[in-house]
Amino acid sequence: MIKKENRNWRRKKRHLSIRKKIHGTADRPRLCVYKSEKHIYAQIIDDDKGHTLVAASTLDKELRETLKKTWNKEAAREVGKLIGKRAIEKGIKKVVFDRGGYRYHGRVAELAEGAREAGLEF
């Protein structure tokens, strides 16, 4: 059986190789995803300045009140919708999707679909 530490180490290694190719700018910032066992987090980052422009997670008060579980696909879709809504309010319409070394499957894919539903393009 593969140990969890080794799996996470391989994910970080994949993420570093992805980050060599993906770079967020002011015109098209980077939508970065991180997931833990119980929560999922998303940030929109301008890499030129090194600033987080918008952030959302299952820990936000808006979502904690409505979500029954924070670790399922429905919660990830709601986080995607929330970050999309916040980005549109700030004038961000196009982003580069950074899956964080995770497979584009399950919660990561649901977050992306939720962000697309809210109006983000990537």
From Swiss-Prot:
Molecular function GO labels: 5S rRNA binding; structural constituent of ribosome
Highest rank taxon of the organism: Bacteria
GO cellular component terms, A-Z: cytosolic large ribosomal subunit
Gene Ontology biological-process entries: translation
Coiled coil: none
Keywords: Ribonucleoprotein, Ribosomal protein, RNA-binding, rRNA-binding
Oligomeric form and interacting partners: Part of the 50S ribosomal subunit; part of the 5S rRNA/L5/L18/L25 subcomplex. Contacts the 5S and 23S rRNAs.
Protein family according to the UniProt entry: Belongs to the universal ribosomal protein uL18 family.
Function noted in UniProt: This is one of the proteins that bind and probably mediate the attachment of the 5S RNA into the large ribosomal subunit, where it forms part of the central protuberance.
Protein's name according to its UniProt entry: Large ribosomal subunit protein uL18
Source organism of this protein record: Thermosipho africanus (strain TCF52B)
Gene for this chain: rplR
